[in-house]
Amino acid sequence: MKNLNLYHFFDCKDRKITMYRLTEKGERIRDMFSDIAPRYDFLNRLLSFGVDRRWRRNAVKCIRWSEGGRVLDVATGTGDVALEIARQTPPSVAIVGVDFSEGMVALGRDKVAGSPYAGRITMEIAPCEAIPFPDDTFDSVTIAFGIRNVVDRSQGLSEMLRVLKPGGRAVILEFSTPRSRLFKRIYSFYFLRVLPVIGGLFSQFGAYKYLPDSVLEFPSQEEFKALMASVGFRDTAHRDQTFGIATIYTGEKGLK
């Protein structure tokens, strides 16, 4: 019987297969996203008033690509970022999406199959902490609204760095807390009081209670950039989106 909590990746340095097992918390998060997968896209549009699409477009504008190259989208969910990458890059660029939720990947594959980009996008089941590709494979690696759900963030970021080509770029889109006092109060009321209730009407209350809690626990912008630098990313930077509700982080892999 297949162990759904055990993953592997190829360690090019030691030329061996390395095994990675999800923690109990990681299992709970994965199962939660599989449960809400059928309503995930609808609720994203509803709860963000559609602005999440603009954030994703802005994030994809930050990637690097080359003719005949490859781009990886981690925590790809139902494939929104993978599809946006396909829209913004030429047909020679191949896109791979990985996610640890089988439910999300199943929906993503269906969405991709019905798009004009079916021949360019492949999707696989894997967590951020164990990306199943060799070193120096991708021009860019993206992750949108997923890094806060990675239990071992240092390991996840290290994996993203590992599979980047020298000179490649990681682009990370994540929720953040606005710095304006007035906007922070409005945002906090909506995020902590309204969002879980609306989410609960259409899906699981617990899942949309987890969302604001996980955002509040996420490091500050400067702290997260420091974490990126600590695993080896260079030239880390960030850009606020919509008054700081979300942030785009970028970091690069040094040339060898």
From Swiss-Prot:
One of its GO terms (biological process) is menaquinone biosynthetic process. InterPro entries: SAM-dependent_MTases_sf (IPR029063), UbiE/COQ5_MeTrFase (IPR004033), UbiE/COQ5_MeTrFase_CS (IPR023576). Pathway: Quinol/quinone metabolism; menaquinone biosynthesis; menaquinol from 1,4-dihydroxy-2-naphthoate: step 2/2; Cofactor biosynthesis; ubiquinone biosynthesis. S-adenosyl-L-methionine binds at residues 78, 99. Its EC number is 2.1.1.163, 2.1.1.201. Belongs to the class I-like SAM-binding methyltransferase superfamily. MenG/UbiE family. Methyltransferase required for the conversion of demethylmenaquinol (DMKH2) to menaquinol (MKH2) and the conversion of 2-polyprenyl-6-methoxy-1,4-benzoquinol (DDMQH2) to 2-polyprenyl-3-methyl-6-methoxy-1,4-benzoquinol (DMQH2). This is Ubiquinone/menaquinone biosynthesis C-methyltransferase UbiE. The lineage of its organism: Bacteria, Pseudomonadati, Thermodesulfobacteriota, Desulfuromonadia, Geobacterales.
